[in-house]
Amino acid sequence: RDLVRSRGLGDVYKRQERVKSGQLMATLHGDIRVLLSGERVALNYLQRMSGIASYTRQIADLLAGSKTKLLDTRKTTPNMRVFEKYAVKVGGGYNHRYNLSDGILLKDNHIGAAGSVRKAVEMAKEYAPFVRKIEVEVEDLDMVKEAVEAGADIIMLDNMTPEIMKEAIRIIDGKAETECSGNVTRENVERLV
C-alpha cells in the first residue's frame, strides 16, 4: 500500500501494448525505503502477469481470424486469481469461470455419482433450471452422444486427439457450444481450429 501511495508512478506504456526486452515500462518516484521494500514483490507480480499475458497473446494471435476463443482455467495460483485472470484478458484471452458459482461444470466425479451423463445433466437442470448453463466434460464419443441427447449447453472435449475432436464436433452439430481442454499448447492449437 505504501508503495502505491508513494509520490508517483508514471506509466510509460499503455495496457496491452507490446513491450520489448529492455524497454522501460514505468518510473517510480518516492521514499527510497518504501520503494525498495516493495520492489521485489512488485517485480514478481509484474513478471508473472507479463508472462501470462505474453503467452496468452501468442496463442490468441494463432487463433486470430477463426471462430475459436482462448479461454482460461479456474485453476489459478492461490490468492492471485484476480490478477492472473486479468492478465489473460490483457493478453487477448477470455475468462471461463471466475469461481464455481459462475456455471455448472459436470466432471467425471459428478457423472459417476449420478450414474450417467444423462442423469447428471437432468439433476443439474432440476437444481438450477434457469440460472446457469450446464457444461459437461466428456472423454469419448459415447459421452459426447449422451451429452447432446441430454441437452447439455456446452460440451468440453477433454484430452481428445484432433481426429476424435473433429468427429465429436460433427456429432454435436451445433446443438451445444464446444470447448476443448487438455494438452492444448502453442505448438498444436492451430490443428484444433
Enumerate the language-model features and the residues they cover.
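Acidic/glycine-rich phosphate/pyrophosphate-binding loops and surrounding catalytic core
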Residues: 1, 7-137, 142-150, 154, ...
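C-terminal non-catalytic interaction appendages of large macromolecular assemblies
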Residues: 182-193
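Glycine-rich beta-strand-to-loop/alpha-helix junction loops that act as flexible
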Residues: 157-158, 178-184
